[in-house]
Amino acid sequence: MTDSAEYPLPNVSHDLTGQVALVTGATSGLGHRFARVLAAAGAKVIGTGRRRERLDALVSDIADEGGVAVGVEMDMTDTASIVGGLDHAEAAFGLVTILVNNAGVPDAQRAHRMDTELIDRVLDTNLRGPFVLSVEHAKRLIAAERPGRQVNISSISATQYDGHGAALYSVTKAGISRMTEALAVEWARRHINVNAIAPGAFHSEMMDGMLERMGDFSAHTPRGRLGSPAQLDSTLLYLCSPASDAVTGTIIKVDDGQSPR
């Protein structure tokens, strides 16, 4: 029988007091929401992005809500910027214990129409950058002999593609899902939990921009709607909190029934 003193009944808590969380792509959309949610749960938050004025606005929003945050400029296509951003995060709040790899860019083009500059930007931002950051984050946790959590934002497009554009986006999200599974195996003995959320179509600055270019398909979804970012809060908190201690290498699909099974 499990000792109830070790595990409360029920063993569920979203309290992140004492944790330090870094959220990439926090200047808009889902990342902005994720940063605010983690701060509201008690974590000290580092929001990263390339737009300083947006970062300042995020920090102000979190402060108004009673949280603590700093904004750090980080370019996910630049290794030096990634490593330097993590250095700045640690200088502000200490060792980062929670990483949310959220930053990403769409392509919204058919593959044969993409120039190599766009291909490189999408690959670097959506896949190479998150891998570099995940590895750098894990190195620091391992050196400090501390456990940690990484939550990668994948997509239902990792496993399905309708051929109407955004092929490379689909490829990068498939890479994020596989990265999640592989790194979870590699770092399990180090007590670093690596999981992913695979959202369907949720309202965000990026998604709304894609809808403008590709057309609004929400009426054709089973529930005739796009999701609200707030509907991802509970999944994010579960994967960032002690409630998911035994969960690693898992990709949780949150799609409002939008994808086939």
Report residues per predicted region.
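Active-site helix of classical SDR
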Residues: 134, 172, 180
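Substrate-binding pocket helix/loop in short-chain dehydrogenase/reductase
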Residues: 110-111, 115-123, 217
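Active-site loop of short-chain dehydrogenase/reductase
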Residues: 19, 67-68, 95-96, 141-156, ...
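Conserved glycine-rich cofactor-binding loop
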Residues: 20, 27-28
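C-terminal substrate-recognition "lid" of short-chain dehydrogenase/reductases
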Residues: 93-94, 131, 225-254, 259
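Alpha-helical segment proximal to the catalytic Tyr-Lys
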Residues: 139, 185-189, 245
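Short C-terminal tail/terminal secondary-structure segment
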Residues: 2-17, 237, 248-261
